[in-house]
C-alpha cells in the first residue's frame, strides 16, 4: 500500500497509560521489528491542541457546552442499560425457541409497518410476518433514541460557574455512511449517535476527539483496526465532518478467535506480545503467522515480512474471524528456526537456559556448538533448550531406571570397545561419527539397534537426545568419551 508507518501512543486514559504499559508497547513492537518511520506521537501531549479544536467546533456551531448533572447522566446510562438488557432477553428467547413454540417478545412493535403489535406468537409466525431481531432492535431504539443534550440549542447554564462538558452536536437526519474496505458499506442512522463528549468536565479531551484530530494532523489516509471498533467509525466520521475534514478510509479487520471459535481471551493462552516471546517464538515467525490470519494472498507459502509487504491487499482479507492455530504457529516457527542464523540461535539458546541456571564458559561453548544441529529439530526456543539440557549434565551422569536396565555386563564390555573405536576416529563430526558407529556395529556382528539405545542412555542419562552422531559432535570428543568411560 505504500505510505509511512507512524506510531502513536493513545494515552488519553491516564489511569491505564502507565510508564510500564507504554514501555511494554515499545518493547513488543521493537521485538517484532516494527520500527516507526518518524518520532512517536503521544496523544496526551497534544491535549492543548485538542482543546483548541473543540473550541473551534463550538465556534462553527458543531459542538456545544453541556451542563447536565451527574444525576441526569446516570438516568440516561440506565436507559441505555435497559435497552441492552431487553435486547439480550429477546436474543435469548429467539435462540432457545422451537419453531412452533409461542415466544413472548415483550417488545412493542407499533409503527413497524407490520399488521399489528405482537404478544405471544410462534417463531414460524414471527419469521413469516417479517419480525427479525434487527427489526426489534430498530424498534427499541426508536422508542429509546440516542442521547440528545437539552443544551444543544444553546440553553443557559444553571449557574454562572456551573461545570460543563463539550459535546458534539450529532446529526439528526440521514445515515452515517462508512464505505469500509473490508466490511463493505455500513450505514447507521444518525439518530442512533449520541451527542458525544469531546471535552470532559476537567478539560481533558476524550479519546474520540483526540484520535480524530491526530488522524487529521498526521495525514492518516487509512485506519486499519479490529472490527470491535466498527461502531466507533460511525462516531468519529461526524467529528471529521464537524471540522470540515475528509475522513480517512476505514478497514475493520475481524478479530482473532481461539481454536474453539470464541473471541480470543486469556483462557486461550498468551495475549501480550512479551508472552509469545516468553513461549519461545521468534519475531519473524509471529509476523508471518499473524499476517496470514484472515489474509488470503492466493497461496499457502510461509511469507517473510519482506515478501508479504509488496503482496498485501486489503481486498484479500475476509470478513470471517480467523482462528488461532497453535500447531500451525509452531510449524511456522520451526520453519524460521531452521532458517535463522546459527550465531543468533546460539545466543537465544544460551539466554533461554540462563533463565533457569548459570552457565560457565565451557557450557556456553558447548551450546554454541550444538545450536546449528539442534535448531532444525525444535519448534520453539523452549523445545530447543529442553533438547540441549543433556549437554549440561554433570559427570558422572545419574542414569534413569530405563537407562540403568540397559547397562548389562556384556553391553559394558561392548561399550569399552566402542570407546576405543571412537577414540581413534580422526574427524569428530556427526556424519563421520555416524559412519564410525555403523562400522563398529558391523565389526561386532550386530545391528545398530543393539547399540544405539544404550549409547544414547550413556550420553544423556536417559534424557531425550538427538541423532547419535549429532549428540557425539555436540558433546565434543573429550566429554563424549568421558561419559562413555564413566559407565564402563
Task: List the predicted regions and their residue ranges.
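Short glycine-centered, acidic/aromatic-flanked micro-motifs in structured strand/loop junctions
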Residues: 9-11, 225
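Residues on a specific face of well-ordered alpha-helices
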Residues: 23, 27, 234-238, 284, ...
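Basic, alpha-helical terminal appendages of large translation-related enzymes
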Residues: 6-8, 16-19, 23-26, 32-41, ...
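Active-site cores that bind ATP or allylic diphosphates and position pyrophosphate for catalysis
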Residues: 65, 71-252, 257-264, 272, ...
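Flexible loop/turn segments at secondary-structure boundaries
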Residues: 14-16, 50, 257-263
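Short alpha-helical basic/polar micro-motif
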Residues: 55, 213, 221, 234, ...
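Catalytic adenosine-cofactor/nucleotide-binding cores of aminoacyl-tRNA synthetases and other
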Residues: 231, 243-398, 404-405, 460-488
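Histidine-anchored nucleotide/phosphate-binding helix
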Residues: 1-3
